Amino acid sequence: MNAVGISLGMKCDAAIWAVENSIRDTKVNGYQTCPFDEMISNLPGIIECLRDDFKYFCDPEHLSLLFTGKEHFVYNKKYRFAFNHESPGHDDLFKTQEWPEGLTHYINNNYAHFIERYQKRIQSFRNYLSNPKNFIIFILKRYNTYQTDLYELKKVLRLHYPNLNFHIIILSNNNNNEVKNTLRMLQFKEDEEEFDRLNYWCG
């Protein structure tokens, strides 16, 4: 079988780790970018998104521009995802990547270019998972997570892809402050389960 590494977040460092450890090909070598490779996600949101089969991922009704106090992020309110690689001004990507419409390229015309980009990435994800010749190695970076915590994720993957052969690699993230800041940025409140779980395990 053909092994394909695909990131499930929480940030793009999961995808970087997969490339550095020869679990995932680079774009130059033919890898087609998938939706969770270059964004900021959370496991409950990913499970809900997969359960919905990405129905609201690119829906402008659920997209907004979120100001975190330092910069603006394209934000999906339903799944609580942030898209830093398409956000105005983030790391001056609009300059280094030469976005055709400048700073606001991905939010212009009701997120038209954002939608186009992510529809392609969603289709790449579906293509990889639907190919019976592929063995999918998912890479998930998440704090204090074990295989026993992934029951719902595995369940929803099998629901939509019943013949899928896969394995999930968990990368630990024990930087408590970094995780808390990320959860706050994604609009999680400190009395929600993600914070409760973090506080219980990390103190």
Q: What does each model-found stretch correspond to?
A:
Residues M1-G203:
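Extracellular glycan-modifying ectodomains
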